[in-house]
Structures are given as structure tokens and as C-alpha cells.
């Protein structure tokens, strides 16, 4: 591309997309932030909602594509916004960004407070929704459900996780220091992290020195239950188990065989941390059980496993799975298999049916010419694979003694796939105690060892242990209870938050609290935010900051 065409392209590019910092002199001369175009349907959805500035920031942010790992345009919008307010920003090599706002009023000489949220969002859509998350804006809608007022999206994730936290931080940065009657604010260090949703990668690579972070109190705005304060979270890590297999074309001899699919579907699935204590069914494990039962019912040499697959995300309980088996082409063999699957389905309904009302386990004949050319696993390989799946820990392993009802340690058997020479199983383990997490991962290693396989484990990210002497907890609890008129909930969450990693990066002496407005259905097209909780949430943030502004 010629220099002229590059310049022409740059001239046509909106300011919020330009990479690199615009000079302070340009803004001093009267330059104005050029925000992204907010779709008319989104404007209609947020009309009249308070606080208006926060909703405007959220709508603008939602008009900029920001999938995990591709947050550049949103980050550039934040930079341009900061410069339009004559605020300084710094970034590190990972793309994390910090914007600095001086304190106002009596808070001018107070210690800085870090306001933190992540910029990226989960990108999920309904199968009948035409939406490109790399280019299209989120289209919002306003509706009433269960007598509550909600803002959601039209067939996609909304991005309130964590767009609400980012919008709140931008609203704080944008408060006019000369506003009459405004609450005093301490110096604010607004930290915007990247690539949170795919494994906390931005927080893991955060460079506190490059970002100029000095605050020793942090408000994480990435929780979704208004009225509760969160003081701890689980750490976690993935284990990729690989089990060698052998395929044998002659396992069924010279007999004619047909193909059958054993399929499990209709399960609820859900988050592998937040929902793990509910006892939801795991599609992979139910499929392993049903397949094992089917092979045993057929009898030696009369059925063999060809393939198995299920699950697609490390942090989701598998909703469905299927196995393909080769079966001798006799009516008696097929009937024995179908009867065994009916019995397995009945047993599963007895175990899970009150919760998993959509659960289905079925066996049906299929015709797939490609699969006829796939040699089945030999009997030993199939037995080792299915036995290993059923031996792996799944669900809550231990509950907390300190916070009754809170899962302390868990494991999720997240996915399985069978290739030519090996089967791969992904597990996601969590614990708020580091040693318990590693003990769980060691159990996974032991199962893999007994199956003749190996394990590659990701570096575990740390949990966040509750601090009973937390000053920010005392202040937040008092102020929240004054606002609510009743006792505030103090909780920990069995899921990964950036807080654990950020404490490691910013120093163990940092004091942290996490909270947010009410958001339901996060990570799905059902995601929605209770609009009536947004104003009190933002006012509460200001209450905390006003209190800290007086702490010299």
C-alpha cells in the first residue's frame, strides 16, 4: 500500500480505532472525542435509564467489537476518551491499560484506589442469529421478566460481563472535578485488563511497573449479584490427558457389522465452577457409562467402539456427548444393545431426572460411509478409555469449612475426543487452596498413568483467600448495609476471578473487594442486566470512594 493510500485510510478511520496516542496538544486545541455510532435500537433500549453517562459508555463500548484477544479497538476508544479528559494513560506489553484521574476535593491528597474490570467479552449467539462479533455492534433490547426490568441483546451475548464494570470506570473518569455538589474522590487508577474470558491471560501477563500501579486498595467490578460482596475466589488449572489407543480392523472378524450411535443430550450444562455444586449431569460421563453398558450387553467380539466426542469448553459442564460403535448385523445383538441403553437411561433419570428434565440417552442405527472405513478400537483400548473417564474425579471434591455451602475444591471432566492413535480428555480443576488444587491434578495424573497415558497441565492460576482483617470489606459492608437497609451478603465464589492473579502482581498487602450489578445468563445469548440495580451499584462505588477520599 502506498504512503498516500495509508494516509487516506487513516483520514477516513474513526478516532477511536486509531492505534497510538493522540497528542495532548491536539485536545488542548479543541479536539473532541469521536465516539462509535450507537445503533438506534440500542439508543431506544437505554433511553431514560440512569445513570445516563454510564449507560452511554456501555452502549458505546457495546458498539465496538471486543472478543477475547481482539480488544484493540475498545482499548483505543478508552485511550481517546482519557485524552479527551486530559487524563494520562499507560499500557503494558500484554495490552492492559491504566488511566489515571487525580483526586478531587479533600481526596486530592488521599491514597489512590484501583478500579478494575476486563475489556473483553464472551462471544456466543443463537444458531438463527446472523452476527459477526469481529465487526458488528451488539444490538440491545429492553424487556420485563419476572417483574424485573432487563437490558439484553438480540440473539447474542450482551457483554455486561464485564462491560458494566468498564462503563462504571469510564463514568468515574469522566466526572467533572468542578461539578457542584459532587462527592470527593481519591486519586483513581482505572485498570482495564484484556483476555480474561479465555483464561485470565491479561492479568497473568500484567506488568504493574509499566502500568504505574501504586494503589493498595482495589475495587473489582466483575461480579453479578447486587447486594453481595465477594471476598474470595478459586484458583484453577487445566489438565490435558492423552491416552494411547490401538485400532484393529479385524476385531469383529469377517462378520457383517452396522453402525450405532449412543447419544446423550438435553442436559443443562452450565459453568464448571458456579454450577458444579448443583449435581448437574455430565454428558461425557453419562455417555461413557452408556457405551460401556452397551458393549458389555453385546458380548465379546460382537460390538466395538469407533469414536467418542463431547464437550467443547474447559469451563463448561458438557451438555451432550456421543459414541459410535460397530455392531454385528444381527437383530439379537442390536436388541440387546437397545435394551441396555434403555436401562442406562432409566438409571440416569432416577439419578438426575428431578433436575435434568430434558435428559435423553438413546441408541440408534446410523449410516455414515466415512465411519465404515474407521477401524474400531481394540477391546483393551476401549476398556482403558471408558474406565479412565469413569475413574476421573468430577464434581465437588471438598466443601469449605470456613464458608459452609461453598465448594472449596472441584474437578470438571470437560471434554473427550478420540483420534487415530490416542484419545484426549480435558479436565478443569478448581480450588481456593493451592495444595488442594495440586492434589486434585495429581489424581488426574494418577488415572492417566494407570491408563498408560500422559498429562500436559497448564500453569495454575492462584485463588483469592478471604482476608478477615480487610479494611475495604469493613467499609464496603457498612456502606452497603446503609444503602440496602439490611445485612449485606459476604461471599466467596467457586470460579476464577482476576483478583487472585492481580494480588500476586500488585502485592499481597493489597486490599480487594468485588461486586457488581445483577447480571443473569452470562456467557450465553440469554445474558441480561437488571437495569434497576445499575444506579445503586454506581452510587455505591462513589460511596466507597468518598469514604476513602477522607483517609489521608
Language-model region placement:
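Zn-dependent metallopeptidase/amidohydrolase metal-coordination segment
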Residues: 46-54, 401, 408-423, 428, ...
Amino acid at each position: 500500500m502506498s504512503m498516500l493510500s495509508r494516509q487516506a485510510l487513516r483520514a477516513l478511520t474513526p478516532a477511536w480505532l486509531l492505534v497510538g496516542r493522540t497528542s495532548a496538544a491536539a485536545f488542548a486545541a479543541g479536539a473532541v472525542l469521536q465516539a462509535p455510532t450507537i445503533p438506534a435500537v440500542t439508543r431506544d433500549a437505554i433511553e431514560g435509564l440512569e445513570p445516563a453517562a454510564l449507560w452511554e459508555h456501555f452502549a458505546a463500548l457495546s458498539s465496538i467489537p471486543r472478543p477475547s484477544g481482539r480488544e484493540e479497538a475498545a482499548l483505543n476508544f478508552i485511550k481517546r476518551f482519557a485524552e479527551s479528559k486530559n487524563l494520562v494513560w499507560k499500557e503494558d506489553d500484554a495490552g492492559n491499560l491504566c488511566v489515571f484521574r487525580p483526586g478531587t476535593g479533600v481526596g486530592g491528597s488521599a491514597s489512590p484506589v484501583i478500579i478494575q474490570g476486563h475489556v473483553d467479552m464472551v462471544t456466543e449467539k443463537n444458531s438463527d442469529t446472523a452476527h459477526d462479533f469481529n465487526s458488528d455492534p451488539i444490538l440491545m433490547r429492553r424487556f420485563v421478566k419476572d417483574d424485573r426490568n432487563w437490558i439484553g441483546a438480540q440473539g447474542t451475548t450482551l457483554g455486561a460481563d464485564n462491560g458494566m464494570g468498564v462503563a462504571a470506570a469510564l463514568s468515574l473518569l469522566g466526572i467533572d472535578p468542578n461539578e457542584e455538589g459532587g462527592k470527593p474522590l481519591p486519586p483513581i487508577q482505572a485498570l482495564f485488563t484484556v483476555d480474561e474470558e479465555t483464561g485470565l491471560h491479561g492479568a497473568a501477563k500484567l506488568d504493574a511497573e509499566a502500568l504505574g500501579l501504586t494503589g493498595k486498595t482495589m475495587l473489582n467490578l466483575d461480579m453479578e449479584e447486587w447486594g453481595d460482596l465477594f471476598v474470595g475466589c478459586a484458583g484453577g488449572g487445566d489438565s490435558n490427558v492423552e491416552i494411547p489407543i490401538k485400532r484393529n480392523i479385524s476385531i469383529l472378524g469377517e462378520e457383517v457389522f452396522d453402525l450405532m450411535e449412543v447419544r446423550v443430550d438435553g442436559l443443562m450444562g452450565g459453568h464448571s465452577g458456579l454450577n458444579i455444586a448443583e449435581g448437574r449431569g455430565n454428558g461425557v460421563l453419562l455417555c461413557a457409562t452408556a457405551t460401556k453398558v452397551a458393549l458389555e450387553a453385546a458380548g465379546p467380539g460382537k460390538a466395538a467402539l469407533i469414536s467418542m466426542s463431547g464437550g467443547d469448553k474447559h469451563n463448561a459442564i458438557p451438555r451432550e456427548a456421543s459414541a459410535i460403535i460397530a455392531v454385528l448385523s444381527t437383530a439379537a445383538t442390536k436388541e440387546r444393545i437397545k435394551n441396555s441403553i434403555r436401562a442406562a437411561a432409566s438409571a440416569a433419570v432416577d439419578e438426575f431426572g428431578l433436575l435434568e428434565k430434558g435428559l435423553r440417552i438413546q441408541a440408534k442405527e446410523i449410516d455414515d460411509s466415512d465411519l465404515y472405513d474407521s477401524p474400531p478400537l481394540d477391546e483393551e483400548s476401549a476398556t482403558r478409555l471408558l474406565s479412565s473417564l469413569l475413574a476421573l474425579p468430577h464434581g465437588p471434591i471438598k466443601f469449605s469449612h470456613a464458608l459452609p455451602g461453598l465448594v472449596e475444591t472441584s474437578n470438571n471432566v470437560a471434554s473427550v475426543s478420540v483420534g487415530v492413535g490416542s484419545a484426549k480428555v480435558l479436565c478443569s480443576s478448581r480450588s481456593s487452596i493451592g495444595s488442594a488444587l495440586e492434589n486434585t491434578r495429581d489424581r488426574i495424573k494418577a488415572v492417566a498413568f494407570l491408563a498408560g497415558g500422559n498429562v500436559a497441565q497448564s500453569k495454575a492460576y492462584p485463588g483469592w483467600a478471604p482476608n478477615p482483617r480487610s479494611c475495604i470489606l469493613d467499609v464496603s459492608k457498612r456502606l452497603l448495609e446503609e444503602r440496602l437497609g439490611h445485612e449485606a451478603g459476604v461471599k466467596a465464589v467457586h470460579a476464577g476471578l482476576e483478583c487472585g492473579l492481580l494480588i500476586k502482581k500488585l502485592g499481597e498487602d493489597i486490599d480487594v473487594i468485588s461486586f457488581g450489578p445483577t447480571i443473569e445468563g452470562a456467557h450465553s445469548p440469554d445474558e441480561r442486566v437488571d437495569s434497576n440495580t445499575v444506579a445503586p451499584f454506581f452510587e455505591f462505588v462513589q460511596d466507597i470512594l468518598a469514604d476513602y477520599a477522607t483517609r489521608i
